[in-house]
Amino acid sequence: MTVTESRPTSTRPAGQPVLEASGVTMRFGGLLAVNDVSLTVHEGEIVGLIGPNGAGKTTFFNCLTGLYKPTSGQVRFAGTPRKPPRASKKTSDLEAVPVQPLEPLTPLPPKPRAVVRAGMARTFQNIRLFANMTALENVMVGRYCRTSSAALTSVLRGPKFRREEAATRVRAQELLDFVGLGKSTEHLARNMPYGDQRRLEIARALATDPKLILLDEPTAGMNPQETRQASDLIFKIRDSGLSVVVIEHDMRFIFNLCDRVLCLVRGEGLVEGTPDEVQSDPRVIEAYIGTGEDDDEDEDEGTDAPQRPQDEAGEEETP
């Protein structure tokens, strides 16, 4: 079974490792959700994570990003945060952001805030926007982890706070331009089309200045046109120098997008390789591609996958 088509290739040479997960295991009581899974991601690389429903893909993401503390194993990261652009310089291209050299791989603490500050960001299966905030305000929220104003300075709104607030607003607008939402700045998140809400989540994640972004089912519930636009955006993110890891059930999407693919089955790594290698492996065909399982089910929660919102986006605070 072959689903790959021609795909844009990166003009950047393969970089050094930015993420190294070794022997990650996660138990919930007597349930072994992830068992001895390892993954290395390099600079400027797109890696896909596939597997049947309940394979442990999102649980593995949660271990990488500090939401779960792995029962055993280690997650090491080499990210040094990108330097934000000066507020006076407006650009819609992330390539204009100067990047510091990566530090050596070091263990990541299992704390979401520490992971974000180290340079790793993520989105979730279900949309988690602030429904009653504008698109610009949602992205600004993501940016505040890069500000240094203390609580008292924020309350008094002193000169330092006002400078950082202005820079945050400029950067948020740049990121909206980058993801194609530059004209939606003042739109409330709850009133935006479903595909735009997904883009807005990505913009908010990019506001943390990551070196690596993890996307959990970014095309869930999208129509074919929105899926193509999501693919183009991910290539654009990759070409700006970031690394990307994507969980997705859409095989055509994942095999046309990724440089490498890891297939999980029952919490264990089954096959890792290029898209051509993975999609032609008999074990993958038997375990996932050829099963005929409903790809729209939520794999870890045992409920339906996120659907298009009818009235408003979910309003939850991200870590």
Predicted feature residues:
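Glycine-rich phosphate-binding loops of nucleotide-dependent enzymes
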Residues: 2-319
